[in-house]
């Protein structure tokens, strides 16, 4: 795997960034074409074993379940300091599900900095 510097951050990331929009719990979020956790973990494990250390996800991908699956896979297959996770926090979520009428969740810094 080839690696490059990520801007001026000092981080080295794989030239391939694995997008995780297709990973998630079916029924959470606006689309039903996501891969369930078992299939997602298989892809993530192979990716890590082949040197991919750069992953892209978002709070709105399957209403957060993409981030959850990625987090568990990283915990099982890599050291957290060996991977770079790019995410987005702009997608309004209500009660963990897109489109719910309940109050917004996860829109503050405290939700993302753990």
Q: Which residues does each PLM region occupy?
A:
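Active-site-proximal loop/turn and secondary-structure-junction residues that shape catalytic pockets
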Residues: 22, 89-93
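Glycine/proline-rich, positively charged
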Residues: 27, 96-114
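Proline-centered turn/helix-capping motifs that create local helix->coil transitions or kinks
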Residues: 79, 94-96
């Amino acid at each position: 795997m080839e690696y490059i510097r990520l801007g001026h951050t000092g981080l080295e990331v794989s030239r391939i960034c694995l997008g995780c929009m297709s990973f998630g719990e079916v029924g959470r979020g606006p689309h039903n074409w996501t891969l369930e956790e078992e299939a997602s973990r298989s892809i993530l494990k192979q990716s890590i074993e082949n040197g991919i250390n750069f992953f892209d996800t978002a709070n709105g991908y399957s209403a957060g379940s993409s981030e959850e699956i990625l987090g568990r896979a990283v915990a099982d297959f890599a050291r957290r300091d060996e991977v770079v996770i790019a995410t987005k926090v702009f997608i309004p979520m209500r009660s963990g599900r897109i489109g719910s009428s309940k109050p917004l969740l996860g829109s503050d810094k405290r939700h993302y900095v753990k």
